[in-house]
Amino acid sequence: MREVKIDYGQKWQAIHLRGIQSAYGKAPFFEYFFPYFQPILERQHSNLWDLNLQLLTICLKLLRRPVKITVLENKETIGEKVDLRGQIVPKGAFYNRSYYQATPYPQLFGLDFEPNLSILDLLFCVGPEAEKVLKQSLKKP
């Protein structure tokens, strides 16, 4: 991912920011959390890795998760810590995971809960309760 450059010849940043504003502008916690994401998405990052790392870092901060991000080039033993790298498969259905079952929370559209939309949906809709919702969503082995 460090080699993947971002094409700034397209206006993808403005399109994404307008899309987020359009979808979540009326969410209860939009005005509080959006200013954290806007400058990151407006900045011209040198590569996809830098953009993703900044977004991950701000999400963890907003979720009050003081997690140290360790970059590993190769898989290695990490002791007693839970290693889910092999469990996260982009093409697999997220709702089939043995370690996670989304806990319903109030959303903007419709009456039915739509799980696994995005961390933005969770933050904009429930604000400071987001960490609690995620903890409740973890399945215990």
Which positions does each model-derived feature cover?
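Residues lining hydrophobic/aromatic ligand-binding pockets adjacent to catalytic sites
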Residues: 1-141
